Amino acid sequence: MAKDKKLVEEITSMNDDFGQWYTDVIKKAELVDYSSVRGCMVIKPYGYAIWENIQKSLDTRFKETGHENVYMPMFIPESLLLKEKEHVEGFAPEVAWVTHGGDEKLTERLCVRPTSETLFCEHYSNSIQSYRDLPKLYNQWCSVVRWEKTTRPFLRTLEFLWQEGHTAHATAEEAQEETIRMLNVYADVLENVLAIPVIKGRKTEKEKFAGAHATYTVESLMHDGKALQSGTSHNFGDGFAKAFDIQYTDKNNQLQYVHQTSWGVTTRLIGAIIMVHGDDSGLVLPPAIAPTQLVIIPVSQHKEGVLEKANELKQKLSAKFRVKMDDSDKMPGWKFSEYEMKGVPLRIEIGPKDIEKNQAVLVRRDNREKIFVSLDNLEETVVNTLADVQKSLLEKARELRDKKTYIAATLEEFDQIINSTPGFVKGMWCGERECEDLVKEKTGATARCMPLEQEQLSDKCMCCGKPAKSMVYWGKAY
């Protein structure tokens, strides 16, 4: 047992050093390994299995809303990238360039895609002629490259996996509907699959996506009180359409520009899961995305009938759940710590005494509760327990977020709150860029979003005292 305890103690306490705790967890839970290329990571099978389950949840919803998957090239000619000035200026510092093919210098540099708006626009300009071609509802699963200065696995890497949706519509109203529809899809997946509560809102002009008419976001709060932009949905209006000449003939035989949207989430969602639900023993995974939903641990497995019963339970439960049975020769205590580390939502212990009593012992990962259950009712109890774990994780995360959400009436009050008790701070804002910049300069916090559900906390801007236009969630962010 001393070894078991040491295993847990190898994780730095999140209260002592949250950053080191995060690093310890992703390494010891075998989610990633480091690469020889700075800022890149190897996503190991367990980490990738989490991403696959997130993918399935999203892809199902994309298809239910009429979207199709496509794939665009990895490379973008420099001339194509330069077509939308505001867009390229937003990404220029992060772009990786290909200058040679083999030994030959290319006549035109190729950008390794940081995002694919320009490629989709080129395709749409060639494939959309008539109103009958609309809407175009495309999504792409791929990796992108952004040459970040500071990196951390899952949260910010030079190359990362994501999905990017790109759609084209006949009217501004349809594009806006799509923008909000996909924002709601993200909120649904985050809350009902990942058990992460979100704030849905609109980004300020300063924080919006380069080239967008408007950017909407789902913001979540991590255990350390820092915000994480967990997904964005952009309304491009007809700006890209004009830059790339994407026109269609309407029902009156008149040429019109299309209206476009773009929306995406990345593998940083895995980082969010870790930082919202994890504890000092490791990962805590919501059952909906856990690669293994329950692990069966045979106790005194060398004794007659134990392994047979454990295998029988595995066969029975595998029809409904993602199940693993660990019959390795490691001690049960080591196994308990190992699967706690990996965040498996439910553990089933079965030993000789349990078999005699026709029972099993269930242990929840989220609250360590032990449940003694008759084998006759095992399947039903597992269903109900996993559902309760999923629900409890969301409730616990929401309680923490609400506890770490504050209100500030002045910049002085804001500064005191954000630097002593990190979290979301709600404050009124006049809408002026100068005040937004002042908040960043004085406190290091940024405007996370103007929530869709507004509150009138006061009628004055917390910075300048002028009439307020909107309530903003502010915070320090990853």
Curated annotation (Swiss-Prot):
Gene Ontology annotations for the cellular component aspect, listed alphabetically = aminoacyl-tRNA synthetase multienzyme complex; cytoplasm
Please give the Gene Ontology molecular function terms for this protein: ATP binding; catalytic activity, acting on a protein; proline-tRNA ligase activity; transferase activity
- Documented EC number(s): 6.1.1.15
Q: Which PROSITE patterns match?
A: AA_TRNA_LIGASE_II
Q: Which UniProt keywords apply?
A: Aminoacyl-tRNA synthetase, ATP-binding, Cytoplasm, Ligase, Nucleotide-binding, Protein biosynthesis
Tell me which Pfam families the record gives.
Answer: HGTP_anticodon, ProRS-C_1, tRNA-synt_2b
Reaction(s) catalysed by this chain's protein: tRNA(Pro) + L-proline + ATP = L-prolyl-tRNA(Pro) + AMP + diphosphate
Class in the EC hierarchy, top level: ligase
GO terms in the biological process aspect are:
prolyl-tRNA aminoacylation
The record's subcellular location field reads: Cytoplasm
Protein origin, superkingdom: Bacteria
What does UniProt say about this protein's domains? Consists of three domains: the N-terminal catalytic domain, the anticodon-binding domain and the C-terminal extension.
Similarity field: Belongs to the class-II aminoacyl-tRNA synthetase family. ProS type 3 subfamily.
Q: Give the record's subunit note.
A: Homodimer.
> What functional role does this protein have?
Catalyzes the attachment of proline to tRNA(Pro) in a two-step reaction: proline is first activated by ATP to form Pro-AMP and then transferred to the acceptor end of tRNA(Pro).
For this entry, the protein name equals: Proline--tRNA ligase
User: By which gene is this protein encoded?
Assistant: proS
